[in-house]
Amino acid sequence: MALRDSKIADTSQSNGFESDNCADGADVQPYTTATFSNITFVGPKVLDANFQNDPDYITAGAYNPNNGSALGKFQAAMQIRRSSHLNCINSVALGWPVGLIVDGEKGGTVQASKDGLFKLQNVYFAGMDAVGSDANKIYKDKLYDAVNKKFIDESQKSYSNTFFFSQPGNKYFDSWSSLVGLDGYTPIAGSPLLGVASFTGWNGFDNVSYIGAFDGSNNWMSGWTNFDPQNTQY
């Protein structure tokens, strides 16, 4: 599970996954080809009804060291770029500004997605401002040329949106409230996340029936995780 403080974001934009093959985007082996399954990304909007993706709001609050450290904005649940071939299956992302960026600024990531060299399958998004964006720091779900830094056609959805919905089992929900409870990550009774996972064609995983990190009845974090370490007396 990935859970972020809504008032702390990286100066270079905060993402759930930010996957590169190499810094300059070179389309060379060995490729980044990790495969992730059953991830739950809890975005900044889920547990903060007042969230604003703005530097005036993202101040780090009481945890700001006041040493000049720069903060930034939240961006995407998944940014796959620079020739990465990262795969993700049976996972859910909730309440991010952007769901997916297949970033074509450097390298061959866009072409790799078209050639089926990486896959996003049985991935559910909910409560995004934009399902997809085609470039870093572009928050519009519009078809965009990341190399030449211009919109191709603002009447069309982003390529990232098109790719997301072309993949088997992917779905989008307007709100996460039909998926998870008030804690932001546990599936509620009857949640669409339950009973729909698929591992067909994927090896090396314990096959479970649910999408995301939790099955709705067993919170494996209980007893050993702490969400308030600053105020805990050890």
Regions found by a protein language model. Give the residues of each.
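Extracellular beta-rich repeat passengers
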Residues: 1-234
